[in-house]
Amino acid sequence: MSDKTSTLKKPIKNGKKFFLLYSAAFLVCAALCYFWFIINKKTLIINSDGWRQHFAAFVYFGKYGREILETLFETHKFVLPQWDFSIGLGSDILTTLHFYAIGDPLDLLSIACPAKYAAYLYSLLSLFRLYLAGLSFGAFCFIKKQNHVSSITVGSLVYVFTLFGMFIVSHHPFFALPMIFLPLLLLGVEQIAAGKRPYLFIVTVFLAAISNFYFFYMLALFTAIYTLFLLVCRYRHVQKRLLEFSLKSQAVQF
């Protein structure tokens, strides 16, 4: 009984240790990478797609959400505006914002943030997405029986602070969403294959689907490939026996 208890406590202890170590290491690495912005009081919004598209959509979504809440509290009616002539020559709001903001749970915070502080919240959330990506990668490593906390921490930092990761922080922040969801989807597949409940997989599929349809089909494709690979590796002995049986059957026929 004591051996079983110690076996259960070890992953929890390693998980807490990883969380603290990774959080501290991420703060240090983020400060080293972006200290120039902090010193010069600059945001992480680049003057191209980041400013014209993503940040504009972030601010618009916050204003859009506040207007819905104001209407709800003042008139006690839930009114969802669906068309805005200020978007180009006029466009559907939900269709336009779905690619940029609507669906990402973190962007809901823009509703509670005044427009004058939106740039700071936008920059903070951009880094927070990378932080979550490292956590999800670490969780996947633990399910693969990798219990070396320091190694997983280093791997998570490498996964996050790549050229791609540092590029998307200022250019396309929501490009970090696949980095968060993919390890969780693969983790969900591993849990289902181990006979555990599929709650994590279901929730991750739901969040990935509503966050961005463009990345969702890519995530679905890679998850399917990983699932096939997992099944092939897990039932390799069955395939070997089937091959031997097939060869013996052909030998008997001849």
Each language-model region and where it sits:
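Intrinsic-disorder/low-complexity, polar/charged segments
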Residues: S48-D49, D104, H148, P178, ...
